[in-house]
């Protein structure tokens, strides 16, 4: 039976030290920046991926390790209801498989993007997409939740053609069940019982890690669970509860893996959304996900970004829902360091911060430092490392180009372990996320401003690729056409 293990039990493996505890007595404040911000990166290609008439958001990105021209991105898709959308490219992002009528993961919802074609799933709503590839590139993976009544389930779909087609669903071609949940009458998105924000990581040995937060319905309790597959996604072990005790109001769990040792590092935040909690944690597995160390606090938010109206909205301007402060981890195999980027409000402006630790002692972290200090809010960050060179790549929604009023996307990169940074404006036109949204029949203006809770970035030898939510042409009465955008940027 999988269980939690103590930090001391894995000291001999070199992953953690004896002096660890659930929480250290203090955490350093952000360090003063001492590096360049003046350089710009190279060529930028921006493409509208979804190219349709209604909203998408939450845009994870994965690249085929055997064919870097093949990438997939997922989304929450509002074309028919709220479901799980997908697009694939086979030319490095210049063109993508269409959203309509077939850019949809079958087997989850009762509908598809084609009103004439019913879905092969049983769920009324789907969401929270996550994507990955197998180490040999032969299989693409897509996970998302399905919701119907009191019941929620997390499913994994597979593609053997780079994302053109996916597991058909239905009794003859079922998806793989990762885990199932019963909400006991509590609605999705309420203060009740529901799972949220899964992610997916595939290690070089093929092990698949899928963590999520599970809101229990008891105040702010939302421990992190993780399910692991050792057979290419055909089945999953019973989920393991990673966080416990006083570390229980958690969210935004992600896993990165050291390719040399196979050790898995799971990071999460201590439930910033709604203003609860202030800390970032890491847990380690040295046995391919069977057991996990106690959670170790490696950083503390000073004033976390929280964009979840009406509960919280702590930057200037009209309110909208968007990513708050969460940890984005990446592993550098050239230095054996675990990096984590996150946003925090420092001196009144939301900035990107970076901290790291040598995995020989995961309790010793660098002092968090502001990355390429900005004149406007940077309200979220995604992080990736190019494994051959150790180049650090970040993307963020950035209000620095408009007097801290409108959104753009910035790409920020470092080739010297964060000593200096180059920043590139990726978007050409700024926009106001409070003026666009997803369809909402119960909202006074017909929309709910919501650009999703995460974006996507991957690092290639000669470029970084990224996906995000941005505005499209309005069709009809309401500005509900949020699109998936892709960019490739040369460092």
Where are the model-predicted features located?
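Bacterial signal peptide processing site
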Residues: 21-23
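C-terminal motif of bacterial Sec signal peptides marking the signal peptidase cleavage site
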Residues: 16-19
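Residue-level signal for mature regions of secreted extracellular proteins and peptides
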Residues: 10-14
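Extracellular, repeat-based ectodomains that mediate carbohydrate processing or recognition
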Residues: 26-491
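Bacterial N-terminal signal peptides that target proteins for export
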Residues: 1-9
């Amino acid at each position: 039976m999988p269980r939690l293990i103590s930090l001391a039990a894995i000291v001999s493996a070199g992953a953690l030290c004896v002096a660890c505890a659930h929480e250290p007595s203090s955490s350093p404040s952000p360090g003063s920046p001492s590096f360049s911000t003046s350089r710009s990166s190279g060529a930028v290609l921006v493409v509208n991926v979804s190219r349709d008439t209604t909203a998408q958001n939450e845009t994870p990105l994965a690249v085929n390790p055997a064919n870097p021209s093949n990438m997939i991105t997922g989304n929450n898709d509002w074309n028919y209801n709220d479901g799980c959308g997908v697009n694939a490219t086979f030319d490095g992002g210049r063109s993508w498989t269409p959203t309509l009528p077939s850019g949809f993961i079958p087997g989850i919802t009762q509908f598809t993007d084609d009103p004439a074609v019913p879905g092969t799933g049983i769920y009324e709503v789907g969401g929270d997409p996550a994507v990955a590839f197998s180490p040999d590139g032969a299989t693409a993976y897509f996970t998302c939740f399905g919701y119907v009544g009191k019941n929620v389930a997390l499913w994994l779909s597979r593609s053997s053609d780079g994302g053109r087609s996916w597991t058909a669903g239905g009794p003859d071609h079922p998806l793989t069940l990762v885990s199932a949940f019963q909400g006991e009458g509590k609605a999705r998105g309420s203060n009740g019982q529901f799972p949220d924000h899964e992610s997916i990581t595939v290690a070089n040995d093929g092990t698949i890690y899928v963590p999520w937060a599970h809101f229990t319905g008891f105040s702010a309790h939302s421990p992190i669970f993780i399910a692991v597959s050792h057979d290419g996604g055909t089945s999953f072990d019973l989920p393991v509860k990673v966080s416990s005790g006083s570390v229980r109001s958690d969210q935004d769990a992600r896993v990165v893996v050291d390719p040399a040792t196979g050790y898995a590092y799971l990071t999460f935040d201590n439930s910033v959304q709604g203003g609860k909690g202030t800390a970032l944690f890491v847990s380690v597995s040295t046995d391919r996900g069977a057991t996990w160390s106690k959670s170790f606090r490696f950083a503390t938010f000073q004033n976390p970004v929280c964009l979840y109206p009406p509960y919280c909205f702590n930057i200037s301007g009209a309110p909208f829902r968007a990513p708050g402060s969460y940890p984005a981890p990446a592993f550098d195999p050239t230095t054996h360091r675990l990096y984590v980027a996150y946003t925090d409000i420092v001196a009144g402006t939301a900035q990107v911060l970076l901290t790291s630790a040598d995995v020989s002692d995961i309790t010793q972290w660098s002092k968090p430092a502001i990355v390429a200090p900005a004149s406007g809010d940077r309200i979220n960050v995604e992080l990736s490392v190019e494994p051959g060179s150790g180049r650090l790549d970040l993307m963020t929604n950035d209000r620095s180009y408009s007097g801290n009023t409108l959104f753009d996307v910035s790409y920020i990169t470092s080739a010297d372990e964060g000593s200096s940074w180059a920043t590139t404006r990726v978007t050409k036109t700024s926009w106001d996320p409070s003026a666009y949204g997803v369809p909402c029949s119960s909202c006074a203006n017909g929309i709910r401003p919501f650009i999703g809770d995460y974006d996507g970035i991957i690092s290639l030898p000669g470029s970084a690729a990224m996906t995000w939510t941005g505005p499209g042409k309005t069709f009809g009465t309401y500005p509900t056409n949020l699109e998936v955008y892709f960019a490739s940027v040369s460092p």
